[in-house]
């Protein structure tokens, strides 16, 4: 295994402490207005300050909407879990108002909107659904009608996300909830997603469900067997590898208890992977990045689809914390070279054509940690250049601690500095960020970037997805970039996680998809009147936008984009990460793959 490849990093904490100690005795030339702006920024990240989100004890914090919302969620889940397999415990009496009414939970007259050999999709027609079910018997009948569609299924699981709460005169309330139910059959899978509008009435200390109406409904059938679109081949391909069994399968929790944090391991699991044909045999191979203290792994594909782990043999088993890697041909010799984003910077390897790698150069990044890599020939000189997203500024040994400290939370500008590495040939790479114009608005928390010629002028433009705020759209004009995200309608102020380009509507123009985080709690809280009462309406709207979810930006062909996310139905990707346009069913239309989740442990409440 390779030794640790590291540079020292001096923490500025002692210097900052000294400056703070000296400040009271120094004459200040700081503009009071700037101090007030700083206070506002700090308020945005201090829980409970100036009407910020509620503490864990919502009742103590005076957030009656959250107290009620928790009760409403419990009531709705009690009924929804009757649909699970095995079904949940029957709800107690006294949860429904005597005058309770409900529409059918699986509306009649479903319209088929899509069919191919893999999927069938049906939707409820637009319009208000009749409240035809009454009382507890009516609700149980509505649940039973929905369950009939799942007759014979196994593994049924329901999920509710209560995303809107409105309290009325003290005795009435309204909620909106996203509902999803899925199950498996021998011949396929079945999934339902719907939006429920519910009204509530108070009876003493209790809240009773008064009515439920299905505002939207969609069901999708996935056909398996010979027509299965995907097959999980993880075990068939990787289980024969000792490295897979002993290192990857135990999971991060296992290694967190065995490797010191200062080696570069943390619970976030911020590691990526790279795919490429390293030896020219026509089969893709897999490079898996690992946290500090564990060697990166290179799985070379065999003729039968299994893999052989060869990282040490081929010279790429680095032990340094690695967030990203990329296979690209950097020297134009026809094989896939390797870039690896290690903790100190980017290490660049040459491929000998047979899959054996030799480190040729390293570009240290002393200001920030490299998180992701994207390559293109931005200056049209015939070789590939590299853009490095750097997310966090360096903080010494405690460089990450799972979450960043953005200021202000929803529009942070205190992140890492991204870097453009220009390929000057003969394995020489120079820092070209400033001279190329890419240092403008370059202190965000950048997770990912995607190159594309969105304006069809012959050069590659760059979109950067930033966590905690606005994104960047850098238009390329003959190798010089200008950030036009604001004027182009492409800032998408959100917790950006990834971005990808694709012509989703087949109009010849490349459109843009950005994965963010959908938060039901964020939607509820930011819509309340008491949320950040001292902030401007613009700031409040930005917080609401932050919780909305994913974004689809349609290229209008005039240098601008239109947000069509809600009309296209793509906002709810949960806590989304990587995303990719791909025509999965070969029908000529770009589909979307979106990964989601975060920390997976034995606790079922984990994301």
Residue ranges of model-derived segments:
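Acidic, glycine/proline-rich Ca2+-coordinating loop motifs
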Residues: 26-607
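N-terminal secretory signal peptides that target proteins for export/translocation
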Residues: 1-8
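Intrinsically disordered, low-complexity proline-rich regions
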Residues: 8-12, 27
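Bacterial N-terminal signal peptides
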Residues: 12-23
């Amino acid at each position: 295994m390779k030794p640790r490849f590291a540079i020292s990093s001096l923490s500025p904490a002692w210097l900052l402490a000294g400056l703070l100690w000296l400040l009271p005795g120094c004459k200040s030339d700081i503009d009071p207005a700037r101090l007030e702006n700083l206070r506002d920024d700090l308020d945005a990240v201090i829980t409970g300050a100036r009407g910020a989100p509620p503490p864990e004890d919502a009742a103590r914090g005076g957030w009656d909407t959250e107290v009620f919302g928790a009760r409403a969620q419990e009531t709705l889940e009690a009924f929804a879990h009757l649909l699970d397999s095995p079904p949940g415990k029957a709800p107690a009496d006294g949860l429904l108002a005597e005058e309770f009414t409900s529409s059918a939970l699986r509306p009649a007259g479903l319209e088929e909107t899509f069919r191919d050999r893999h999927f069938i999709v049906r939707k409820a027609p637009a319009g208000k659904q009749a409240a035809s079910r009454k009382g507890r018997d009516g609700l149980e009948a509505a649940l039973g009608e929905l369950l009939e569609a799942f007759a014979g299924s196994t593994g049924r699981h329901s999920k509710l996300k209560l995303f809107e709460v409105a309290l009325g005169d003290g005795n009435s309330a309204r909620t909106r909830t996203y509902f999803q139910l899925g199950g498996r059959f021998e011949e396929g899978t079945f999934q339902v997603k719907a939006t429920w509008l519910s009204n509530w009435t108070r009876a003493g200390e209790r809240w009773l469900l008064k009515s439920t109406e299905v505002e939207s409904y969609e069901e999708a059938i996935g056909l398996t067997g010979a027509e299965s679109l995907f097959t999980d081949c993880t075990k068939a391909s990787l289980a024969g590898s000792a490295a897979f069994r002993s290192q990857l399968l135990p999971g991060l929790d296992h290694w967190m208890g065995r490797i010191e944090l200062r080696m570069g391991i943390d619970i976030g699991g911020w590691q990526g992977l790279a795919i490429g044909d390293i030896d020219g045999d026509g089969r893709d191979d897999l490079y898996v990045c690992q946290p500090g203290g564990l060697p990166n792994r290179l799985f070379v594909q065999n003729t039968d689809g299994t893999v052989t782990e060869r990282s040490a043999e081929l010279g790429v088993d680095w032990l340094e914390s690695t967030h990203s890697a990329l296979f690209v041909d950097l020297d134009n010799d026809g094989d896939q070279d390797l870039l690896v984003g290690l903790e100190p910077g980017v290490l660049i390897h040459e491929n000998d054509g047979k899959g054996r790698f030799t480190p040729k150069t390293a570009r240290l990044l002393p200001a920030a940690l490299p998180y992701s890599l994207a390559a293109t020939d931005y200056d049209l000189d015939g070789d590939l250049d590299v853009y490095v997203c750097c997310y966090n500024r360096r903080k010494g040994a405690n460089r990450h601690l799972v979450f960043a400290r953005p200021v202000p939370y929803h529009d942070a500008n205190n992140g890492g500095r991204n870097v453009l590495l220009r390929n000057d040939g003969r394995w020489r790479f120079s820092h070209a960020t400033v001279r190329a114009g890419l240092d403008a608005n370059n202190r965000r928390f950048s997770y990912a970037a995607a190159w594309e010629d969105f304006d069809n002028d012959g050069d590659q433009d760059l979109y950067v997805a930033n966590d905690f705020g606005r994104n960047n759209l850098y238009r390329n004009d003959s190798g010089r970039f200008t950030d036009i995200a604001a004027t182009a309608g492409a800032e998408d102020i959100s917790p950006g996680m990834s971005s990808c380009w694709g012509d989703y509507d087949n109009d010849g123009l490349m459109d843009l998809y950005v994965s963010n985080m959908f938060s039901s709690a964020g939607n509820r809280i930011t819509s309340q009147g008491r949320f950040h009462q001292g902030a401007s309406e613009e700031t409040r709207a930005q917080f609401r936008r932050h919780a909305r979810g994913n974004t689809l930006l349609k290229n209008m062909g005039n240098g601008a984009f239109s947000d069509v996310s809600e009309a296209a139905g793509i906002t709810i990707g949960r806590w989304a990460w990587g995303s990719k346009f791909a025509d999965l069913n070969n029908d000529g239309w770009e589909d979307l793959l979106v990964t989601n989740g975060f920390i997976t442990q034995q606790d079922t409440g984990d994301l």
